[in-house]
Design a protein with these regions (language model features):
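The −1 position to Zn-ligating cysteines in a subset of zinc-ribbon hairpins
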Residues: 43, 47, 265, 329
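Short, solvent-exposed turn/loop segments enriched in Gly/Ser/Thr/Pro and often Arg
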Residues: 88-89, 246, 332
């Protein structure tokens, strides 16, 4: 493990971490992904009303075991820095999940888990120690609100699992992620206090985004105003190394800073920052475009990942995304901040270069 507790959220979220791969990685046209995010199942034991994959995962797709094994072979052969086990569905529902984690851990590649935390049993605790960090969905303070959001009364079970993990995890960073939505925005202060009491290393707030255009998902302006007023009352006591709540409210209730990049390409794609693998086997370069075939560079059900990456199709999609980024069309993507940092670094040389296996 490369991390050391206590985590500093300012560093974990610092987009300047993209400078290191930009400086150190050569021959960018043949590079492996710096990191990879795996969304290998659409199955989930929750039914969160704000889920950004709600419609897209209705077909209940799962990448089959033999294809996952082949993908892990590619991950190890390519020497990817960090692997996120993440969204779409709940990664801990994947059959033979523990075997895949063990295999990657034995290769010394760093891993992170983004999970709702409910299926983590006592027998899984040794496995959890193999992650660089674990981020658990932390959606409410009240039982009733948890049930409204997820469809289940899971608060007590989840809090119990967090306490168990916190008791045994030494090197692994244990964080919490709260999606701010129409059911929990009045509980943000109690959620913050609960996370502090449970002893997690950080708490990230992410305002709900209506990626699928279903309506009634994102906060209204009135609800954002309420949130801002609530946070203002505790602002002096907020620990910015623990939470991004102050930043969220200063940005008008948005996770990403509302600035538009224009006039330069998507440097993140040029340095092969991240590959996203979806539960239908599709490979994408940007999370907001997952499911849109216009931006898909290939499918691991049809051929090996190593045949897709740096292929002609891959290069074509990079050109398309470069064009869109130059015109200021990109939004709700972490690469926007990376690109802003790199553009400034290219022009001025300014920025703090440090290694982080996850982009």
């Amino acid at each position: 493990m490369i991390n050391t507790k206590k985590a500093d959220l300012n560093k974990l979220l610092n987009p300047e971490k993209v400078i290191w791969p930009y400086k150190e990685r050569k021959d960018k046209t043949s590079l492996a992904p710096f990191s990879m995010e795996l969304h290998l199942t659409s199955l989930c034991n929750f039914s969160c009303y704000h889920c950004s994959y709600q419609d897209r995962r209705s077909n209940r797709s799962v990448v089959d075991g033999s294809t996952i094994k082949g993908l892990i072979d590619s991950i190890i052969d390519l020497g990817i820095n960090g692997v996120y086990w993440s969204g779409g569905g709940e990664p801990t529902t994947i059959k033979d999940f523990t075997k895949y984690i063990d295999r990657i851990a034995n290769s010394k590649i760093e891993q992170a888990l983004i999970t709702n935390g409910l299926l983590i049993s006592d027998k899984w605790i040794p496995l959890m120690k193999k992650f660089n960090y674990i981020a658990i969905s932390f959606q409410a303070s009240r039982k009733e609100t948890y049930e409204k959001i997820t469809g289940y009364d899971v608060r007590d079970k989840l809090f119990s699992n967090i306490r168990k993990l916190n008791d045994v995890l030494d090197g692994t960073i244990l964080g919490a992620r709260c999606v701010i939505n129409k059911y929990n925005y009045k509980e943000i202060v109690p959620i913050y206090n609960d996370a502090k009491e449970l002893g997690v290393d950080y708490l990230i707030f992410i305002p709900a985004v209506d990626y699928e255009k279903r309506g009634n998902v994102e906060l209204s302006e009135e609800e954002k105003d309420y949130l801002r007023d609530e946070v203002k009352d505790i602002e002096s006591s907020l620990d910015d190394s623990f939470t991004n709540l102050r930043r969220i409210t200063k940005q008008g209730g948005a996770y990403y800073k509302k600035e538009v990049n224009r006039g330069f390409p998507c440097y993140a794609n040029q340095i092969r920052a991240t590959a996203f693998i979806n539960y239908d086997g599709g490979v994408w370069l940007c999370q907001p475009h997952i499911g849109n075939q216009k931006y898909c560079i290939g499918n691991i059900n049809d051929c090996k990942f190593t045949e897709i990456w740096n292929s002609q199709r891959h290069c074509e999609v990079i050109e398309l995304l470069d064009s869109e980024h130059e015109m200021g069309k990109c939004k709700n993507c972490r690469s926007i901040a990376y690109n802003r940092v790199l553009h400034n670094y290219i022009l001025t040389g300014a920025g703090n270069s440090f290694h982080d296996p996850f982009l």
